[in-house]
């Protein structure tokens, strides 16, 4: 009997993954990860659960109940230090440099598919590691692995896994690859799992829901600055340019608008002058670009294709792009059709139809060879 270790989060997806693997005849053990401590990490402002039981402890209790239901052993491991050093400091430093990072992707790279796998393989000696992600792995005749989209396109999580190296996908199982979320809930209900109706987790990976402005103030105190039109007209003050992203409409403090008048949208940022630029047009030309520089690229497979698709943010429909490799880990992408709100700091994931080829960090954005003032 082959042994598999499942990352058990307390949620329904990982619970059903463990259930399916046990029914398939595997020897199943589970591991719960604790990666955030509000007291140790000075997470006070913007924390709605500060005076309640820690949400991660509630998740652990759910994971423990599921493991007892399934008759599998549950281990608990603490990656609070690793998460702080490898994920959160990067996240904060990116904001400090006026970028818009995606901590969920870095969390997968450094914690779920690195620290967790290292712990599980060294301590528990399984043949496989399983995760409750909605993703698929495809093997060719030489057993080379590719990351691919799952059956449930609405829950597709390949964007969040896009920067994983090929070595991190070795001996990984995704039991939910051929199931929809509705089917997962149905399986959980039919088998009486205690978390069958539990809401999906939201917010920052392993941290949860926060008042984001207040949360960032724990680590990066806001610096008041000017909100201007592109022509330099002063409108009002903002609470810190790092708190806004390209294309943002809400929380600009520019008042209500009469019927037929568009609200203002963020079309540019300048960290050096601490200035936020806005225009009253959701389709303003300054929101669009036709070229971007991508750095820190992870690529799985050959680099022969130049005409592929890209996703610059989660749930964005795939966009046609042309690749131009500049070196082993840097490329530029061209998209003459123009794309809205391509934002520095975000991850650009690359696809060949349903195969996720890799990803990198958006560094700079251009339109007609002129750099956009987004940072």
UniProtKB/Swiss-Prot annotation:
InterPro entries from the UniProt entry: MnmA-like (IPR004506), MnmA-like_C (IPR046885), MnmA-like_central (IPR046884), MnmA-like_central_sf (IPR023382), Rossmann-like_a/b/a_fold (IPR014729)
Region (Interaction with tRNA): 155-157, 313-314
Top-level enzyme category: transferase
Cysteines paired by S-S bonds: 107-205
GO process annotations (BP): tRNA wobble position uridine thiolation
Origin superkingdom: Bacteria
The protein's Enzyme Commission number: 2.8.1.13
One Gene Ontology cellular component annotation held by this UniProt entry: cytoplasm
PANTHER family in the cross-refs: MITOCHONDRIAL TRNA-SPECIFIC 2-THIOURIDYLASE 1, TRNA 5-METHYLAMINOMETHYL-2-THIOURIDYLATE -METHYLTRANSFERASE
Family: Belongs to the MnmA/TRMU family.
Protein name as annotated: tRNA-specific 2-thiouridylase MnmA
């Amino acid at each position: 009997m082959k042994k598999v270790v499942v990352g058990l989060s307390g949620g329904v997806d990982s619970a059903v993954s463990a259930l399916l693997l046990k029914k398939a005849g595997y020897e199943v053990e589970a591991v719960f990860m604790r990666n955030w401590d509000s007291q140790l990490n000075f997470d006070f402002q913007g924390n709605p659960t500060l005076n309640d039981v820690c949400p991660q402890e509630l998740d652990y209790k759910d994971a423990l109940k599921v493991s007892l239901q399934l008759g599998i052993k549950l281990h608990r491991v603490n990656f609070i230090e690793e998460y702080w050093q490898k994920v959160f400091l990067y996240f904060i430093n990116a904001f400090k440099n006026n970028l818009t990072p995606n901590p969920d992707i870095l969390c997968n790279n450094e914690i779920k598919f690195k620290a967790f796998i290292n712990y599980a393989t060294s301590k528990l000696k399984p043949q496989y590691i399983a995760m409750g992600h909605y993703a698929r792995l495809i093997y060719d005749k030489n057993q080379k692995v590719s990351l691919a989209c799952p059956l449930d396109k609405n829950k597709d999580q390949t964007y969040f896994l896009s920067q994983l190296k090929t070595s991190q996908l070795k001996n990984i199982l995704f039991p939910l690859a051929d199931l929809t979320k509705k089917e997962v809930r149905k399986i959980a209900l039919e088998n009486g799992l205690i978390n069958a109706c539990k809401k999906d987790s939201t917010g920052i990976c392993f941290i949860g829901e926060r008042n984001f402005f207040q949360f960032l103030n724990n680590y990066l105190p806001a610096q008041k600055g000017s909100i201007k039109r592109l022509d330099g007209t002063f409108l009002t003050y903002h609470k810190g340019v790092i708190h806004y992203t390209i294309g943002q409409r809400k929380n600009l403090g520019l008042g209500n608008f009469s019927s037929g008048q568009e609200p203002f949208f963020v079309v540019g940022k300048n960290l050096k002058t601490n200035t936020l630029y806005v225009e009253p047009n959701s389709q303003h030309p300054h929101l669009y670009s036709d070229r971007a520089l991508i750095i820190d690229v992870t690529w799985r497979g050959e680099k022969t294709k130049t005409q592929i698709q890209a996703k610059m943010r989660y749930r964005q429909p795939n966009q046609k792009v042309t690749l131009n490799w500049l070196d082993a880990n840097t490329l530029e992408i061209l998209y003459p059709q123009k794309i809205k709100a391509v934002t520095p700091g975000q991850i650009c994931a690359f696809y060949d139809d349903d195969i996720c080829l890799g990803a990198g960090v958006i560094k700079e954005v251009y339109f007609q060879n002129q750099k956009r003032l987004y940072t």
